[in-house]
């Protein structure tokens, strides 16, 4: 879930900034645009459940205004050092592509020559590393237009890229393995991801509604267990790593409802092979919105949709950023129907991406029990809407 914003992207600053790939503090595109914007009317909308087809749906969906590929993971070195990472790619369309192709060039008027810089697509990517043992959190954002091959996405074989950052598969017609590349000052990753299970459809057969208004929805699936092996360069020194990652995929053209201002998203991988995803949408008055929802994946692979009423979340700790704004920083999550009772704590307090607006996305530790069985695990949490735009 993304990211994911008070679910709106400001396209004018994005368009002005995208002459080339660059580090940027433009608004994160993990924000969906408002359906009240007349410009969204020509885009397809997520209105009804659809038939998902893999591996095709790992690739882009140009009929929709925005989508993202969101990968997070917890990794360990052979000597026990721990790292977390986030690598995320966002595709935002400025206008619909008339022929349905991502990156199709805008039409030109009579007497006007097309420029190689013209584009219908903007891409933004975030790369963050949590170096738990050294208590470091580093992040970078890049932004580019699709023109001239600066950024883009394709389905066969899967490839999503921006500048030197990429998610790609080596063979056509498969679901993994996938390779991740990204680098920023002090840290770089080269990782292979191997799916351990089939994609999991969230919501109503993959349709995830964000409010009561038609079109305020996305098509949403997850791959909650990706085995990871590869290498991280830290200050130029290689560290061999292994662990688990999580892939989230969403696409749509709508937004949050008018009362919704942010959300808390949990993606938890438990040691018994099960997984829990839940997003808690927050209204202006601080209450949890009724469209909050999630998914439970049992260790045998069976899937259960979770409604807002199924899940109890209590905040048990907090953290303040450099501006004094408070984020929740510890939680107790209970799902009575599953006899599930979990505690969740950040691996590092400061995992805030100080983009515009800022958001917190970080590695967490999980403990608790299900019935009489003790459980542990790791995961990622995303917190949006707690800090002011700057």
Predicted regions and their residues:
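Structured soluble/peripheral alpha/beta segments that form catalytic or ligand/cofactor-binding pockets
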Residues: 22-390
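Bacterial N-terminal signal peptides that target proteins for export
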Residues: 2-11
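Hydrophobic helical h-region of N-terminal Sec-dependent signal peptides
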Residues: 12-16
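N-terminal Sec signal peptide cleavage junction
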Residues: 18-20
